[in-house]
Amino acid sequence: MNVLILTGAGISAESGIPTFRDANGLWEGHAVEEVATPQGFARNPNLVHEFYNQRRRALLNPEIQPNAAHVALADFEREHLENGRGDFLLVTQNIDNLHQRAGSQNVLAMHGQLLQVRCVYSEEIFDWTGDLSVDTPHPEAPDDDSMRGCLRPNVVWFGEMPIGLTQIEKAATKADLFIAIGTSGVVYPAAGIVAQTPPHCRRIEVNLDDTPASSAFDETIRGAASVEIPKLLNHFSAM
């Protein structure tokens, strides 16, 4: 049984990570165009850096920990692969590292990772836990003033290509089980993954509420991921 999992903001919200986008579509009072686009970064890098600095600090708060859903997914993956039951890929839209901290191995972070930065010139990626600013030196050339400010958050902004689309499509087309957890069903291309799964694939959506994509699933489970995912995965482990 080849398994494909897709997770969104809903699974991390239960760990205390806010979704940031409010009912008016604003991110902490800012329009998306200001803090989550290449154009916004070019116009006001200080604002964008501070926005992500705040998010990075919040993620590093010791109170932010993987919840029962993250742990259940990691345990299921380990058992699934150890017993040779098929392929497993966890695709997340989240930029936190809670899946990895829970022990998940085959994680594809399609929107990047908050605890990484990328050089705008070389595309090199570096692990990063501190703040960023327009004066931050390059980690490999700290004395080169021409390289100051060349780092940006390694996250996918609106208008940029998500990571790993070919790998995701390949996993979707051969999936026997597809579970979407805590996703809005409106952000593409993630929202279109369910349509790439084959006819025999069992498609399950786990969310607090209905989404625009709910009708594409064979089953919908309404409830908190930390409650529903352990129960659901226990069912498949026992099969």
From Swiss-Prot:
Q: Which Gene3D superfamilies match?
A: SIR2/SIRT2 'Small Domain, TPP-binding domain
Q: Which CDD domains match?
A: SIRT5_Af1_CobB
Top enzyme class: transferase
Q: Which residues form the active site?
A: H111
Please verify whether the record's keywords include Disulfide bond: no
The cross-references to InterPro entries, in alphabetical order and at most eight, read: DHS-like_NAD/FAD-binding_dom (IPR029035), NAD-dep_sirtuin_deacylases (IPR050134), Sirtuin (IPR003000), Sirtuin_cat_small_dom_sf (IPR026591), Sirtuin_class_III (IPR027546), Ssirtuin_cat_dom (IPR026590)
Q: Does the keyword Transferase apply?
A: yes
Any idea where this protein resides? Cytoplasm
The positions annotated for binding NAD(+) are 8-27, 93-96, 182-184, 207-209, 225
What Enzyme Commission number(s) does the record list for this chain?
2.3.1.286
Cite the Deacetylase sirtuin-type domain residue spans from the record: 1-239
The UniProt keyword set, sorted, is:
Cytoplasm, NAD, Transferase
Q: Which GO terms describe its molecular function?
A: histone deacetylase activity, NAD-dependent; NAD+ binding; protein-malonyllysine demalonylase activity; protein-succinyllysine desuccinylase activity
Q: Which SUPFAM superfamilies match?
A: DHS-like NAD/FAD-binding domain
- The record's note on its domains: 2 residues (Tyr-52 and Arg-55) present in a large hydrophobic pocket are probably involved in substrate specificity. They are important for desuccinylation activity, but dispensable for deacetylation activity.
Q: What is the similarity comment for this entry?
A: Belongs to the sirtuin family. Class III subfamily.
PANTHER family for the chain: NAD-DEPENDENT PROTEIN DEACYLASE (PTHR11085:SF4), NAD-DEPENDENT PROTEIN DEACYLASE SIRTUIN-5, MITOCHONDRIAL-RELATED (PTHR11085)
Q: What does this protein do?
A: NAD-dependent lysine deacetylase and desuccinylase that specifically removes acetyl and succinyl groups on target proteins. Modulates the activities of several proteins which are inactive in their acylated form.
Name of the protein: NAD-dependent protein deacylase
